[in-house]
């Protein structure tokens, strides 16, 4: 009797607690935080990291530095200024926690927090733009990457942008008209003297000290015209003024992310699979080479999956990596001697950072479908959570359920997808929105996805489709759409639609489609090929691909994948890929177009042209241009507005009152 009573009480409590939960709302973007850039202290007792939150009054994001101890039971906020701080790093002697900030009206500088206490002090007074820094092993020097300073003479009238570069546009950066370059410098912590290590017309990035502090490896493309290829190489220079850099890698593709082994005898790095000038669909491979040169060992080539975030184990016997697999991202390690891979932690989740602990184990960040990213310790291949910044908010929500599905396209291709079902979904066919990922070389994973959760919270089933062109399924799967955009991907989307309708999940009369970037491009392609969708929202998309030549930032891809339009009848390729615009009269779907005013990635002309076409054809449409926004929106109020616009548009065409 008593046991039955307790069971009844437990059920009642569970029902009450669940009833108190609520669905996501667009205004919740102001409550979500983001965790990033974890760094372990030299003795392994503390982890510094960043937390980004939203200041609703100023309509902007703020980032500050926090610490959590390795046990995960003590958390301390280290900075709390009016401006953001980022790039936390520990001095190897463990005396300081450094970070970068733009305080006191200065450009970005390095600041120090003494671990014995006290306020942060400004260490550097750099002229130019600081983009990266790295402590020397003895904590006496810091390698800096600084962009040459602007000419800021007083009372100078604005001048026209004089452009001479082949690749002259980049989102956020704008027109690449100036002749400033990122160079490597050496900063003496005691004297504050700055020595120039590299000069010239090339950019240097990613400085990494050798363990004995005598050398610095860095990445640079020093070909005749770096704008015309992706041939970045690893270079090594002695850590002293007047030294000359020596080229370490000679692969005609791209080499990057160098990491010295703990004994300094080897360098691990990431290398492209292809040595072509540019290929969108490439996979990074883990490479290891003797630090004096010699044979290159490609440890992960046979894996046929992209790897990233390489880190040496403390004993130097293995290299940890993150592996992008089908719908997940897992932690693995490669034994350097044998080349064999071992999975450390995997499952239906997504790992996004990796740091070796100085004693044993790893530090990582991980997201799951029902929880945004938190920090975790990996010990003996087991996870232990260190941070808990999301629980209070997430636990108050009734989130969509997330499950995997596999559909078959009309040509037989099998496609992995994720289905989001709204909380407390009725047992009936639902209005369903396909929200298509961008890239195209990306994928939808078992991780927390705000956009799809937000759409599901408004009563929609939401489908994510890893169409051909996505990664996580091997190089051939990614390259399947080479110079053939909007064909196989659309077959995969339509195949998923057929499957979800056949299973009684989706109402065939209430299908919608949306996406951003390549997801917006695929939205345009799909509604031009099939009229089943009753509403669409295309974000940062394009359709008249020929008109983007020299207008967007992808000149290298266009020249290498489609060719220059005036050569070899290449213009016909561009026209074939422009069918959503050239055959806009086939579109029947009411479509909303969204774009950032300053987007140089997929410029607003792509959305404007499609809006004009549908407006001319009297198809219901609207165009939303967000002032001052780039390809990725940064202003919180505009992100909230975008969700509200999704609701308004899809509700208008996909929801109806039952008779």
State where each predicted segment sits.
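Short loop/turn segments that connect beta-strands within beta-propeller blades
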Residues: 69-73, 114-118, 188-192, 238-242, ...
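Non-catalytic accessory segments flanking enzyme active sites
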Residues: 39, 143-145, 152, 170, ...
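Hydrophobic beta-strand positions that form the internal "hydrophobic ladder"
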Residues: 44-47, 94-98, 142-143, 216-217, ...
């Amino acid at each position: 009797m008593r046991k039955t009573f307790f069971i009844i009480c437990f059920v009642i409590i569970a029902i009450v607690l669940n009833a108190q939960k609520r669905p996501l709302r667009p205004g919740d973007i102001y409550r979500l935080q983001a965790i990033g850039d974890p760094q372990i202290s030299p003795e392994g007792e503390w982890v510094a990291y960043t937390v980004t939150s939203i200041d609703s009054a100023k309509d902007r994001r703020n980032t500050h530095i926090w610490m959590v101890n390795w046990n995960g039971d003590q958390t301390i906020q280290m900075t709390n200024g009016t401006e953001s701080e980022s790039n936390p790093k520990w001095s190897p002697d463990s005396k300081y926690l450094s970070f970068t900030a733009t305080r006191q009206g200065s450009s970005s500088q390095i600041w120090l927090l003494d671990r014995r206490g006290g306020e942060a002090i400004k260490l550097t007074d750099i002229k130019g733009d600081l983009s990266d820094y790295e402590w020397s092993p003895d904590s006496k020097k810091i390698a800096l990457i600084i962009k040459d300073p602007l000419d800021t003479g007083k009372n100078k009238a604005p001048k026209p942008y004089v452009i001479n570069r082949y690749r002259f546009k980049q989102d956020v950066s704008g027109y690449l008209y100036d002749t400033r370059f990122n160079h490597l410098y050496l900063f003496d912590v005691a004297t504050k003297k700055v020595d120039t290590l590299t000069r010239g017309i090339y950019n240097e990035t990613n400085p990494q000290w050798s363990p004995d502090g005598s050398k610095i490896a860095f990445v640079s493309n020093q070909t005749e015209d770096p704008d015309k290829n992706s041939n970045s190489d690893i270079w090594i220079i002695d850590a002293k003024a007047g030294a000359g850099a020596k080229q370490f890698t000679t692969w005609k593709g791209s080499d990057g992310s160098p990491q010295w082994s703990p004994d300094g005898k080897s360098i691990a790095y990431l290398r492209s699979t292809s040595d072509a000038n540019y290929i969108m669909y490439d996979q990074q491979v883990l490479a290891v080479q003797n630090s004096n040169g010699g044979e290159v060992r490609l440890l992960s080539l046979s894996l046929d999956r992209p790897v990233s975030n390489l880190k040496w184990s403390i004993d130097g016997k293995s290299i940890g990596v993150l592996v992008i697999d089908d719908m997940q991202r897992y932690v693995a390690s490669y034994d350097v001697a044998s080349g064999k891979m071992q999975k450390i932690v995997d499952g239906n989740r997504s790992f996004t950072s990796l740091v070796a602990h100085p004693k044993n184990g790893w530090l990582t960040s991980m997201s799951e479908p029902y929880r945004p990213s938190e920090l975790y310790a990996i010990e003996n291949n087991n996870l232990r959570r260190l941070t808990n910044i999301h629980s209070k908010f997430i636990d108050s929500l009734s989130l969509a359920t997330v499950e995997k599905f596999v559909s078959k396209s009309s040509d037989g291709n099998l496609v992995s997808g994720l289905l989001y079902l709204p909380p407390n979904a009725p047992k009936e066919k639902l209005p369903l929105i396909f929200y298509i990922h961008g890239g195209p070389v990306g994928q939808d994973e078992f991780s927390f996805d705000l956009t799809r959760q937000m759409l599901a919270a408004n009563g929609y089933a939401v489908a994510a489709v890893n169409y051909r062109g996505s990664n996580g399924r091997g190089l051939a799967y990614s390259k399947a759409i080479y110079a053939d955009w909007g064909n196989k991907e659309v077959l995969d989307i339509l195949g998923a639609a057929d499957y979800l309708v056949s299973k009684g999940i989706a109402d065939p009369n209430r299908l919608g489609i949306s996406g951003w970037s390549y997801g917006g491009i695929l939205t345009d392609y799909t509604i031009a090929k099939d009229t089943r969708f009753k509403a669409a929202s295309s974000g940062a998309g394009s359709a008249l691909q020929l008109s983007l030549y020299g207008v967007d930032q992808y000149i290298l891809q266009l020249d290498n994948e489609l060719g220059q339009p005036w050569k070899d009848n290449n213009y016909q390729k561009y026209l074939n890929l422009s069918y959503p615009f050239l055959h806009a009269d086939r579109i029947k779907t009411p479509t909303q177009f969204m774009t950032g005013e300053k987007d140089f990635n997929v410029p607003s002309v792509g959305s404007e042209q499609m809006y004009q076409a549908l407006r001319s054809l009297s198809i219901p449409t609207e165009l939303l241009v967000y002032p001052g926004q780039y390809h990725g929106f940064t202003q919180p109020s505009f992100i909230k507005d975008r969700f509200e616009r999704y609701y308004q548009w899809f509700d208008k065409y996909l929801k109806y009152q039952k008779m």
